[in-house]
Regions:
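Predominantly the C-terminal beta-signal and adjacent terminal strand-loop region
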Residues: 62-63, 143-175
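Extracytoplasmic loops and strand-loop junctions of Gram-negative outer membrane beta-barrel proteins
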Residues: 25-28, 117-124, 152-154
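Gram-negative (and chloroplast) outer-membrane scaffold detector with strong preference
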Residues: 46-114, 142-146, 173-175
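Cleavable N-terminal export/targeting peptides
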Residues: 1-23, 114
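Outer-membrane beta-barrel proteins
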Residues: 31-33, 45, 63-65, 79-81, ...
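Internal catalytic-core helix/loop-beta-alpha segment
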Residues: 113-127, 131-133
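Transmembrane beta-strands of outer-membrane beta-barrel proteins
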Residues: 24-28, 55-57, 73, 89-93, ...
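Solvent-exposed loop/turn segments connecting transmembrane beta-strands
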Residues: 29-41, 62-70, 131, 157-167
């Protein structure tokens, strides 16, 4: 009985020790989305709850292209696998909120048509939508210094009405 109690105590202490990573990072990245068909920029906050499990909050904004703009907010989970000295790979899963807007969706031949449309539709011919979706993908990171990492990531976002692949690269800084 004493051996079982000792084994349980050692297991609990080990579990607690592995959960004390508590590292926090902030970062910035550049990305390309296949649905936006343009580059975007983003910021992220990461929190390692264990040595292998990391939570991440991300905000991305895509530059306007042909009247189309988009931003998204993501919450992802990573499971880090050390694959070489200073290199880690990770799968990711998460959720996203995406908002997009297309200006000039309806074209007008005259000012009267535009006024009629605005009175009946309430918009200037723009179309916009917001939706929730899922993220699935993976990434790789390289530890440049004790405080700086570079990384690349590829994820697929399932968004109601439109799915998109997003590729990105950026830097993170340990706080």
């Amino acid at each position: 009985m004493k051996k079982i109690f000792l084994a349980v105590c050692v297991a609990l202490v080990s579990l607690n020790a592995s959960a004390q990573k508590d590292e926090q990072n902030i970062g910035a990245h550049v990305l390309y989305g296949t649905d936006a068909k343009n580059i975007g920029f983003g910021v992220k906050y990461q929190h390692n709850i264990t040595y292998a499990i990391r939570l991440e909050a991300v905000g991305d904004y895509y530059l306007k292209s042909d009247g189309f703009t988009m931003f998204d907010v993501n919450v992802n989970g990573h499971y880090l696998f050390p694959i070489a000295d200073k290199v880690k790979a990770y799968p990711l899963v998460g959720i996203n909120y995406t908002h997009w807007k297309q200006d000039g969706f309806v074209t007008f031949d005259s000012e009267e048509q535009k006024e009629w449309w605005y009175e009946h539709d309430g918009s200037d011919g723009e179309m916009k939508d917001s939706s929730l979706g899922l993220n699935i993908g993976g990434g790789i990171q390289y530890q440049l210094t004790d405080k700086i990492r570079i990384g690349a990531e590829l994820k697929y976002q399932t968004i109601s009405g439109a799915n998109t692949a997003v590729i990105g690269a950026g830097l993170t800084f340990t706080l």
